[in-house]
């Protein structure tokens, strides 16, 4: 009767092993979940100010802000670099922008009529020559 008692004990040990494996897997998945949460928290964390002014390869990849500014050249802040162009003074009072639309179109229409008359004369000349 002793042998049957030992067999169930060994079967219990074999049953305990898979449960220990699953607990190890649970621990591993929990660690991965923590790492994922940490990565996400770093992703959504605002970028910190970096005072490093070096543009070497090591410093360009130092942090996310350095990579964006130095590596990619993206600057989100405006430092007044853009200057507005001064308004142009009108040098000639009779420039094309001062003329009304009807005056400009009136001047361009006679040119079209002249082209049409030239085309008509060319067509008549070709027609007679043949």
UniProtKB/Swiss-Prot annotation:
Residues 1-30, 78-130 are annotated as: Disordered. One of its GO terms (cellular component) is host cell nucleolus. It is found in: Host nucleus, Host nucleolus. Keywords: Activator, AIDS, Host nucleus, Host-virus interaction, Phosphoprotein, RNA-binding, Transcription, Transcription regulation. Residues 11-28, 92-108 have a biased composition (Polar residues). The phosphorylation by CDK9 does not seem to be important for transactivation function. One of its GO terms (molecular function) is RNA-binding transcription regulator activity. Its main location: host cell. The modification Phosphoserine is found at residue 94. Residues 109-118 have a biased composition (Basic and acidic residues). Pfam families: Tat (PF00539). The modification Phosphothreonine is found at residues 85, 89. Residues 79-91 have a biased composition (Basic residues). The keyword RNA-binding applies. The keyword Ribonucleoprotein does not apply. Residues 67-77 are annotated as: Core. A motif (Nuclear localization signal, and RNA-binding (TAR)) lies at residues 78-90. Residues 50-66 are annotated as: Cysteine-rich. GO terms for biological process: positive regulation of viral transcription. The Arg-rich RNA-binding region binds the TAR RNA. This region also mediates the nuclear localization. Belongs to the lentiviruses Tat family. Transcriptional activator that increases RNA Pol II processivity, thereby increasing the level of full-length viral transcripts. Recognizes a hairpin structure at the 5'-LTR of the nascent viral mRNAs referred to as the transactivation responsive RNA element (TAR) and recruits the cyclin T1-CDK9 complex (P-TEFb complex) that will in turn hyperphosphorylate the RNA polymerase II to allow efficient elongation. The CDK9 component of P-TEFb and other Tat-activated kinases hyperphosphorylate the C-terminus of RNA Pol II that becomes stabilized and much more processive. Interacts with host CCNT1. Associates with the P-TEFb complex composed at least of Tat, P-TEFb (CDK9 and CCNT1), TAR RNA, RNA Pol II. Interacts with CCNT2; the resulting complex is unable to bind to TAR RNA. This is Protein Tat. It comes from Human immunodeficiency virus type 2 subtype A (isolate NIH-Z).
């Amino acid at each position: 009767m002793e042998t049957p008692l030992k067999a169930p004990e060994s079967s219990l040990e074999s049953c305990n092993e898979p449960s220990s494996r699953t607990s190890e897997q649970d621990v591993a998945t929990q660690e991965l979940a923590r790492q994922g949460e940490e990565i996400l928290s770093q992703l959504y964390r605002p970028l910190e100010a970096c005072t490093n002014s070096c543009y070497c390869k090591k410093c360009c990849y130092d942090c996310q802000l350095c990579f964006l500014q130095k590596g990619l050249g993206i600057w989100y802040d405006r430092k007044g670099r853009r200057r507005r162009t001064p308004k142009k003074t009108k040098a000639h009072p009779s420039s094309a922008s001062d003329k009304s639309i009807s005056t400009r179109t009136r001047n361009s229409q006679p040119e079209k009529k002249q082209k049409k008359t030239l085309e008509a004369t060319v067509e008549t000349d070709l027609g007679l020559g043949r």
